[in-house]
Amino acid sequence: MDFPGHFEQIFQQLNYQRLHGQLCDCVIVVGNRHFKAHRSVLAACSTHFRALFSVAEGDQTMNMIQLDSEVVTAEAFAALIDMMYTSTLMLGESNVMDVLLAASHLHLNSVVKACKHYLTTRTLPMSPSSERAQEQSARMQRSFMLQQLGLSIVSSALSSSQSAEEPTAPMSSSMRSSLDQRTPFPMRRLHKRKQSVEERARQRLRSSMEESAISDVTPESGPAGVHSREEFFSPDSLKIVDNPKPDGMADNQEDGAMMFDRPFGAQEDAQVPSQSDGSAGNMASRATQVETSFEQEAVAEKGSFQCENPEVGLGEKEHMRVVVKSEPLSSPEPQDEVSDVTSQAEGSESVEVEGVVVSAEKIDLSPESSDRSFSDPQSSTDRVGDIHILEVTNNLEHKTSFSISNFLNKSRGSNFSASQSTDDNLPNTTSDCRLEGEAPYLLSPEAGPAGGPSSAPGSHVENPFSEPADSHFVRPMQEVMGLPCVQTSGYQGEQFGMDFSRSGLGLHSSFSRAMMGSPRGGASNFPYYRRIAPKMPVVTSVRSSQISENSASSQLMMNGATSFENGHTSQPGPPQLTRASADVLSKCKKALSEHNVLVVEGARKYACKICCKTFLTLTDCKKHIRVHTGEKPYACLKCGKRFSQSSHLYKHSKTTCLRWQSSNLPSTLL
């Protein structure tokens, strides 16, 4: 046997006791105001109060709780405590921000969602025709809360009191306007998040109930409309529908009332807005938009790896002709994120060199080169307008490549020789190579002797240098830009010098990709350090005669002028750096022993040899050089992870490593 009006009667009695100070066991102090209340009611409504009372259970000092008046104002708490006892919140433009802040502090999730929804929509509620119509609206809203608990509504007491005290005519306009006004709210909410399948099923049922609710509320049958909706709130339907009201509140005038029809136990999952009648069509259009955006992103991602002018014959395995064309800055093609080096292979195709498959999709671009490839304003004038034609064959004797050993000599003043090695076989197509003997760009097979057997793909050519193979890394590649390259090993051709110009086409990314391709293909076993391109707009040219450590008066001129073969005007270089005097050098002996550190004149006397960036202290310069070399001297003693900066190691040891260590502790210690 059920007593449907029992819960409403209990809360009415509790509210009466609170207002008259009867049987209250706690006092909430907000500023200079005191609010008497019951612990059980506060704990049932707010997890904040539940935590306070449960921790200090039995402590008599917790009878008086003081709240921060800067966070919770007295007016806002008065409205919230009225809502706890009556499920009615007086919300308007004047107090919505105070109520939102106080509800967030007290963990009243349903009130927070209601306030956010009110601030988002900024829709002023319609004014009720009379106070009695407003009171009748409040009673009907509270009846929904009781129906969700699986109880039938008491019709005798409510209908008799309403019919004896109030006419039902004023209710029609106010109630119909308040119900009709809720329809635009869910339309805006729909575009904020994608809802799950369960929510869609619930909202479809809510929309049907809303239609019946609007049709049932008429002037002739105001209280009877409540009974006609009883069938939607049977205990069976409650398993599917947990929020039959579309908004969980009734919007009134600026000082109107918001009625919370949710049971107090389910406040954590309460969602204020729901779906309107057009839910199916809106969800379908939303899903279509999401799918279209995903397809567009996928197409754009694939398109960014397409080559600009590919002329690669797939069937020509023994002899492939790759044409790399320099495009102006205002090129209409969308592939602006990848430099021209990556255009040697299409997005789905790959170029096989000595058994190492280097796919364009797997090439890792350094961030500096990819950002400067098309964003540099000088890139349109720095590019060489001619077409660089490469003759790429599987015959290793006919292929001139820039081996890593060219850039990793131990003596800085020596000449660097071009050699053949399987460690690095990607020729540099982005630099302007000027051959002294009027040779074509980047030696073709006719440039060298045709003698010698051709090695099969995947074979390893013996290193002509006397250095061990493990010295083929760690040295920065940019330090030898502009040094004369002498062709010595295996070739009897003429000598040629190369002046590298920073043409804005990702010069350094070509070397880093060449180093990356070999370890991924398994052709070489040296470690891989990712190189970061220097930030200087022009790659510097350093002559061996200028690096003499003995002559203190000799000046190291960082010549940044760009040379072109076809008579283009040279670009002005960066400010020239002058080598420090003998007095300064004598005071900076420690810096002279450091690799890649240069002592120059001026206040910032420590310069990076790779990119010519100057620093005030030697420590800062050494930290910067690690960006180029990829060194990580600082290791974590707990997990073994290495870092290039000591600050990174400190942050790791205080945060990430502690979490990793705590996750491995036995559960008994936690």
Swiss-Prot record:
The modification Phosphoserine is found at residues 234, 366. Residues 345-360, 444-459 have a biased composition (Low complexity). Keywords: DNA-binding, Isopeptide bond, Metal-binding, Nucleus, Phosphoprotein, Repeat, Transcription, Transcription regulation, Ubl conjugation, Zinc, Zinc-finger. A zinc finger (C2H2-type) spans 606-628, 634-657. Gene3D superfamilies: Classic Zinc Finger, Potassium Channel Kv1.1, Chain A. Residues 24-93 form the BTB domain. Residues 158-256, 268-382, 414-433, 442-470 are annotated as: Disordered. Residues 361-374 have a biased composition (Basic and acidic residues). It is found in: Nucleus. There is a cross-link at residues 239, 317, 325, 399, 410, 535, 587, 590, 638, 651 (Glycyl lysine isopeptide (Lys-Gly) (interchain with G-Cter in SUMO2)). Its main location: nucleus. This is Zinc finger and BTB domain-containing protein 5. It comes from Mus musculus (Mouse). The lineage of its organism: Eukaryota, Metazoa, Chordata, Craniata, Vertebrata. The gene is Zbtb5.
